[in-house]
């Protein structure tokens, strides 16, 4: 991550799932886009894509680079599509009609 790197050193009280997901998100670099399913699998929780999305929506101020995570079709988060698109574009990612263009999974 860039200067927006999350400060998640104090993870006391977090579940193992939350800590595992945070560790994956901490490794994402500027301009890197992944799917919810990829985050779940990399965190050791394959099949938990919805839980990753739920976590990101429940903890919006936790310092996660949530804007770098999209659906398998490249679709942006519905409740914050504009902000997510702006952040991704600022990192050089092409976003067209609410989707990350060129996402090949």
Report each predicted region and the residues it spans.
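Nucleic acid-binding interface residues in structured DNA/RNA-binding domains
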Residues: 2-105
């Amino acid at each position: 991550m860039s200067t927006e790197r999350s400060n998640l050193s104090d993870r006391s009280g977090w579940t193992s799932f939350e800590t595992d997901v945070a560790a994956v998100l901490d490794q994402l670099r500027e301009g890197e886009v992944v799917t919810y399913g990829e985050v779940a699998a990399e965190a050791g929780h394959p099949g938990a894509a919805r839980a990753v999305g739920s976590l990101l929506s429940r903890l919006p101020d936790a310092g996660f680079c949530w804007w770098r995570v999209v659906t398998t079709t490249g679709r942006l988060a519905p409740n914050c599509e504009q902000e997510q698109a702006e952040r991704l574009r600022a990192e050089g990612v092409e976003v067209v009609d609410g989707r990350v263009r060129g996402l090949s999974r």
